[in-house]
Every structure is written in structure tokens, then in C-alpha cells.
Amino acid sequence: MTANLLDYDLEGLAAFCEGLGEKRFRATQLFRWIHQKGASDFGQMTDLARSLREKLAGSAHIQGPKVVSRHDSADGTIKWLFDVGAGDVIEAVFIPETDRGTLCISSQAGCAVGCRFCSTGHQGFSRNLTTGEIVSQLWFAEHFLRQHLGRQERVISNVVMMGMGEPLQNYSQLVPALRVMLDDHGYGLSRRRVTVSTSGVVPMIDRLAKDCPVALAVSLHAPQDALRDSLVPLNKKYPIAELLQACTRYQASAPRDFITFEYCMLDGVNDQPEHARQLVALMQNHSAGGLSCKFNLIPFNPFPASGLKRSAMPQVAAFAKILMDAGIVTTVRKTRGDDIDAACGQLAGDVQDRTSVDRRIAAQRQGMLGGIKVVVAKGMDV
């Protein structure tokens, strides 16, 4: 079996080249061809010696994700469904803005955390993605978008690990993928523009601070443990006090001077004025220890299995005002891609359990998505 070169960061690729009897600097050339130019054929790499290209052809390949379908939202958001084998599907979403392009990518097929408000969690957990499967979402999206938009310059400026899965429960594959994103010979993204979102795996937050500190977003969703236990089951293992202490430690290494806290607004559950006041007290208590925060209030995207409802916008505005009046920087997330199930918490689409995955792939391959624009894709020609 040949090696998929998307599985390697630059150091790993250098070791691979040495194993072929080549100098380490060849890895830099190869890395640029793969990630900056989107090459998938060694024959394209004209500045590499023919002998090296022949070695690579016999021992390696560059395999991107298998695209099942592409969905285009009326607001410009694009969602791809990728088949990663054995009935597992993952999704990535591109969100265009006037000043940036953000790609939301997955780290696992499914998710084991099981947050009550997240449809992905209701799908269940299948497996961790490999480094190559994580990186390939960016590799495919960046080079597809350049073709699609007719642009030579970089399209994706921000990456958020907010797709399917808990990134810090796939740590060994996540960190090399982050290094590829950050490497100047790869995508050259700023640490400030790569965000890992976590439900609160405390030991891995500490490791990430040492190994590859990028922007951190924490799914908080409640001001006290009893409520968070019911919404984010991982809280029973890593309660709020431990989580915020880890965030304070992380901030010393973080590329931004604050930690973002995500808060999904659930009608009658966590959106009352007393919840906002409890959050203010909680953050003021930890700010004395050096924690600086920003809150991102997220409108809930309903799905039948949750039994939850979205907070009314006046309620969200009142909640935000309490936080802002206390000096906490607060934003309300604008939902994007709702019409293609690409918004936050919707990245399982219509998957409610593992048995429906095969039916879902088959339906989408046939373009049977009830009015959603579907483009069945082969390779990069989407």
C-alpha cells in the first residue's frame, strides 16, 4: 500500500523523503506542490527530478476526499458531503464574507460527546479521522474554490474546527493537521485565524497550549454545572471550574488575548436573565485570575430529536445586553447555510442514527434532496 502524502506535516514528509534516499529539502518542494498548488499528480511537479517523481509514483499518492455532493445556499455558503469509507460521511462548509473566507471542517465521523442541542451528537460516534482526512477537506476546498471563483490568490483565510466531532478527542491526528495549515510552505494561515472548538477536554487543552497553540473556542452553554451536565455530558468529567482554569492557563500561550465562549441559546433552558447574571459572576470571578473572554451567542438550529426550541431574538438581545453592560464583549452569530443544513449544530444533516447513513448517501447521489441544489461531484470538477 502506498502512502497518502496528505497524511504528513512537513517534518513527516521530510522523513518520508529520507526514506526514499532523498535530501530533506525535497520535502519542501513537494509540500508546496501539494498544498499551495493543489497538485495530485507527481508528473505535474516539473522542478523535481524525474528519478524522484518515479520513486514517488511507486511509493506514494495524493488522495483527496471522495465528494458525494455539493450544496449551495442562497447566502453563498457551500457545503460538501465527503464519503470516507465504510458508510461514514463527513461534511465541510465554506462561509464567504466580504473580508474573509472561512472553512468549517470535521475532525471525526460522528461525535461521542453527545451534546443535547447538536444533531451531530445524535448521530453517534463512528471513528476518528486521519490527519490526511482532516487536511484533505482544506486541500480540496481551497483548490476547488480557486477554480470555481476564477482566482489565483488564496480563498480560505480562516479555518475553524467546528464541524463534526470533538477535535481534542482526536488529538494525535489533529496536531499534525494544524501544523500543515500553519506552515508557510503549506497554507500559511495565521494562528489567530485557525480555531479549535472544544466541549472542554481539559487535559488536551493544556497539551495544545504546549504543542500547537491556536485560537481556542469553548462550548460553554451554561453558567453552572447542574445545567451544563444536562446539555454537555462531558461536564460531568471536566466541570466548569476545571475548564475555566484550563482556559486561563491556555491564554498565556494563545495567539489572541481572549478565549471565545460559545453559548447556544435554548428557549426556556439557558436563556433567562438569571443565567446571564450567573455568567457575569462566573467570568468576573475567573477574570481575577487572568481570564479574558468573548461570548458568541448562537441561535439554536432545531432538529426533531432534540426536543428544544430556539430562543426568540428579543430574548437573545436582552441576554446579550446583560453581558455587555457588565463589560463582556458579546456577539450574536449570524446563522449561515440554514437552507442546506450547514449551520452550527446541523452538520449531521438528516442523519439521526448510524443505520440511516447508507440511505442518506444513496439519496444524495441521486440528487433527491427536496429542493436543495445538489451538484454530484467527481474529483475537483464540482
From Swiss-Prot:
Its EC number is 2.1.1.192. The keyword Cell cycle does not apply. One of its GO terms (cellular component) is cytoplasm. [4Fe-4S] cluster binds at residues 111, 115, 118. It catalyses: adenosine(2503) in 23S rRNA + 2 reduced [2Fe-2S]-[ferredoxin] + 2 S-adenosyl-L-methionine = 2-methyladenosine(2503) in 23S rRNA + 5'-deoxyadenosine + L-methionine + 2 oxidized [2Fe-2S]-[ferredoxin] + S-adenosyl-L-homocysteine; adenosine(37) in tRNA + 2 reduced [2Fe-2S]-[ferredoxin] + 2 S-adenosyl-L-methionine = 2-methyladenosine(37) in tRNA + 5'-deoxyadenosine + L-methionine + 2 oxidized [2Fe-2S]-[ferredoxin] + S-adenosyl-L-homocysteine. Signal peptide: none annotated. Coiled coil: none annotated. One of its GO terms (molecular function) is rRNA (adenine(2503)-C2-)-methyltransferase activity. Disulfide bonds join 104-344. InterPro entries: Aldolase_TIM (IPR013785), Methyltransferase_A (IPR040072), RlmN_N (IPR048641), RNA_MTrfase_RlmN (IPR027492), rRNA_lsu_MTrfase_RlmN/Cfr (IPR004383), rSAM (IPR007197). Reaction proceeds by a ping-pong mechanism involving intermediate methylation of a conserved cysteine residue. Specifically methylates position 2 of adenine 2503 in 23S rRNA and position 2 of adenine 37 in tRNAs. m2A2503 modification seems to play a crucial role in the proofreading step occurring at the peptidyl transferase center and thus would serve to optimize ribosomal fidelity. Belongs to the radical SAM superfamily. RlmN family. This is Dual-specificity RNA methyltransferase RlmN. It comes from Polaromonas sp. (strain JS666 / ATCC BAA-500).
